[in-house]
């Protein structure tokens, strides 16, 4: 019987690499009885710990990764001291250099992106020009526009010494170490015990025996080999790809004129010819004291060989990768012999978002924890500490939700018989970047991994990004080129921004009591910050959520939604309505005692009518044979209408043929596909379909008629294609039973009494400059002549059209922001509601056996879309209110010209009644007998909005959107509201933009603890909406004035988006008339 089988254990660690050893050491040091099992021998090079050096780096773009790296620095010293080995890391510093524009979605983030975190953490750095790089380092032929960032708090890990130290410490603290012990199966026996089946091989490799050993807890730390344990034990496997990374050792020139690398270095350049097999990412180490003099490791940060199982590892190294490195050395480091002395390789396990997997195994009662994937060597002491805390306490003091096993809608897990859900990178091996868009500062509180310690139990996991969010991310990332030019400006004011602002003195003025304003107030109140809401409308709050109640009948359903009325149940909308997310608005309101009553919204039903060209069909009618008479054949012959070949198939097939090209391109070559999408922003939908379909204009007009409102194809094609992707998966829709304004009223009830001041029409926002020359407050003036108000920050949440009437000249806004406020396109939308004595459309007899229980009917008549209520269906005596006309764009402009005065509206109602009767094939007189009242609403003629919802024109997304996400030059005036969000046109855009504005305020004021609380209580937004480089931040005449306002000159929240996105594979078919009419 093997000696190690005699006992039960507190912890068994499966995998004896660096992470496993660090975990075993930490647990044993805490007094636990620990067994560490290694399938091979300790110190073997068959996994990821081969070679003699690794990078310890602290330059990260993401806040949370920078914080973890900073925390690890002290733990490396603690580990070295405990082992009695002294320094385990040689702190040489790190030079990052290369193309400052590299990294818009690339695997390494950006060259300049880490600077904000270095400043926030008080870590030194220096920006170098190309000439300075070549003067201080042995590099040559560096392009003149390239730049460098040197940071001293980085170093070379002495890998052999680290492994030896960890092994020695494990033995020192009583951990049993067993090699040639392969874990075959883990069973969870109870809430407090696991059983592990081990195949143990004798030293001579001849005799194998299987045994079982029990433990209270287990850790799987076998990294590339983890699926060999997970799959047989738990019936699923981790969707990971393993890179066979190659590196080479070159001989540097010796002697008095030796080639000396003073530090580690990393070079950022884009791929040659956009070919990922021609990567230009290279890194290197100086010659280290624990190896032969003048031997320097230099390597390509890419891997042509990628495998799924470590047992498929190739013999030798990949010559392609070595030759790429040799070419670069020959070109840029003439003092190094371009023939490698020798080459080495190591395995690097990776998942779709390039981050760690660090979590409890599901359904094991938190008895089994796992770690795998990512570039982890630099975090070894911290990972050992985290894993030991999870094993001992079931929680850790560090925020690790970014590394959760269930992130990405389960994209990491492949169950038996399933195909992978994620898309792994194909060539490049990202070293230190994540797909998550919002960082989380290390919280001082203890946070369990399966639930949060805050009252709401909110998870900080960043949501999966939609294509629309990815598009915005890319636009924001492209504005980093001038980053280094204003570091000197930041440094001049650094001392002024070194202390935290007083929360007591921090006041926020919110202009507008719509969804964005109310949501911002809820967040600020939760964070303990002062705020006031200034609403222009004396009659109501809620902005473009407007539930009108007809006065004649007071029953529950005598209502009509003149604004937002339906919500798709898709991941994008989680922040609004997902009750499974404790940070969603509906969850917050329910916890406050205001449950939002949702019911299904019927977007379309089979009996809905489609009436075009005088032809009436039902929504479930197939569109294969031109039933609506759009074809040349039905209109007098060739050239009279639409060519037959286009009309004798579902119109959706014609659109899908174009849109699917984007799906295929993004799947097959993300970078190329995304470039195509970016370029498409310059097109209108009409122009793109005409040029790229290519479809004749008659066909484009036909598609627009069937697909959406008249004139909407003149808007940006990028809007069309992103909606197509984002909403393709949405089958379920919701509405609010009793009126959407229940959301608004519930939000108001959660706020402190008296915080909303109605009738406050803002006329001017200006700066108040203190004695120091910094902007100390913003002053808000009002139309009623009352005394202006002072606030530290102002969030404007109304429409940009209404903001246009406010004097902002003193704020010195950027040109692009002023242009956006003036010219950003808002769509026109009109709703006309009719109240009847009864719901005749639900009466089977009245409708000849075809009642309509919700949904919509579509027509080419002026009313265009008729919407039947989804609430109160089938209930006796319920009010008969329907939307007789819901129009957008040109249709809305024309019908809206009759909205306003009573005589015009009487003409309009007669027209609507006639159209309604014609669509439903009933006499107008019959409907007149049932008619009670009407309500018309034109959002363009509304005094307080002057537009329905933002819908960008060609190029506006790429040209104007980035400026809308930034505050004013002093960091105190913030734009929110749906138009400033990537999800404009939807309530979720209002919520996300409000979150972003509050986050910016916390950044400017240096309130990092409140930023952690924000993420803890309110989760993350799925948008990359952090402020980026803009001309407004370069102006040296405007000093930023908050303790942390420097961030707004250089904070680039980079997102490497390639592996994060998966194009939809199965779009909903549009082969029946039910699809006609669009969504908005």
UniProtKB/Swiss-Prot annotation:
Residues 1-450 are annotated as: Putative sarcosine oxidase. It catalyses: sarcosine + O2 + H2O = formaldehyde + glycine + H2O2; L-pipecolate + O2 = L-1-piperideine-6-carboxylate + H2O2 + H(+); an L-alpha-amino acid + O2 + H2O = a 2-oxocarboxylate + H2O2 + NH4(+). The chain crosses the membrane at residues 508-528. One of its GO terms (molecular function) is L-amino-acid oxidase activity. Keywords: FAD, Flavoprotein, Membrane, Multifunctional enzyme, Oxidoreductase, Transmembrane, Transmembrane helix. Substrate binds at residue 886. Residues 445-464 are annotated as: Disordered. It is found in: Membrane. It comes from the Eukaryota. Its cofactor is FAD. It is a single-pass membrane protein. Its EC number is 1.5.3.1, 1.5.3.7, 1.4.3.2. Catalyzes an oxidative deamination of predominantly hydrophobic and aromatic L-amino acids. Metabolizes sarcosine, L-pipecolic acid and L-proline. In the N-terminal section; belongs to the MSOX/MTOX family. PANTHER family: AMINE OXIDASE (PTHR10742:SF342), FLAVIN MONOAMINE OXIDASE (PTHR10742). This is Putative bifunctional amine oxidase DDB_G0291301.
